[in-house]
Design a protein with these regions (language model features):
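Beta-strand/loop-rich accessory regions of lumenal/periplasmic or secreted enzymes
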Residues: 1-257
């Protein structure tokens, strides 16, 4: 996993950049036949990485990694290629092959990391300025928006995933001086940045149980399942599920000042 992204001696990452396949369940996810039960059965809510091979060249580093659940079952294989150019841009190319004997459904396919809550100035080009998911985003108009993690987070009575944005071209996370991280991709992606950890969001039963730890949680998703209407109607339609097949995606991260 990528453990450091540095700008003039200042560390930008609070946690490593890792693969993410799960989201804290929404009310709909808990009732959907393709939702949270299948994700938890596969152990996607508690993943670790085991390096199988590592190759380095003058321009890049390639890592093959087994993605394991808490039972040490392999849920898939990921290949990460990290390339750094002379301007400080870090390209992270990821290929993931799920093991479909274990994995029957995925909430998302992307990368996640945490940063200091100082990086709370968020701007992006994508659908906004409200929350959007792949199966409910027509109300979001594509444009450049400025927001904060606090504004992106919706305080549901029962804490759950929230704050997603779709059809994103780029996103910038910065502190009040303008220093931070700029992210872009070679295709439209989804992202969220919220003021709580996924672990806490999953564990908390009520709003008053949400406690801040000084960090923000960032998700950069090549794919994320829709939310459906399973609490009162149909679940997520097939075309809005994450495909269970080998997929590749790429994000480029730039330290900015």
């Amino acid at each position: 996993a990528l453990t450091s992204l540095n700008l003039n001696g200042k560390e930008l990452l609070a946690t490593p950049l890792t693969l993410s396949l799960y989201r804290p369940a929404t009310d709909n996810d808990n009732r959907d036949k393709n939702g949270a039960r299948l994700w938890r059965d596969a152990g996607l809510d508690c993943l670790t990485q085991k390096v199988v091979s590592l190759r380095e060249s003058k321009t890049s580093t390639t890592a093959r990694v087994e993605i394991l659940n808490a039972k040490t079952q392999r849920v898939g294989i990921a290949d990460f290629v990290y390339s750094l150019d002379r301007n400080g841009a870090l390209k992270v190319h990821t290929t993931f092959q799920p093991d479909t004997t274990i994995v029957k459904s995925m909430a998302r396919l992307g990368l996640t990391f945490r940063v200091s809550n100082a990086y709370d100035q968020v701007s992006y080009l994508g659908r906004g300025d409200n929350e959007t998911y792949i199966d409910r985003n027509q109300s979001g108009k594509i444009g450049v928006y400025q927001t904060t993690p606090e504004r992106m987070f919706h305080y549901y009575v029962a804490p759950q995933s929230t704050g997603n944005r779709t059809d994103v071209r780029w996103v910038k996370l910065a502190d009040t001086s303008g220093e931070g991280i700029f992210v872009e991709s070679d295709r439209a992606f989804q992202f969220s940045i919220i003021p709580f950890s996924d672990v806490l969001l999953e564990k908390a039963r009520h709003i008053n149980e949400l406690e801040r730890d000084g960090l923000l949680t960032v998700h950069l998703d090549a794919e994320q399942a829709g939310v459906g209407t399973a609490t009162c109607g149909p679940g997520v339609l097939p075309q809005y599920l994450v495909p269970l097949k080998k997929q590749s995606f790429e994000f480029t991260l730039y330290p900015v000042k």
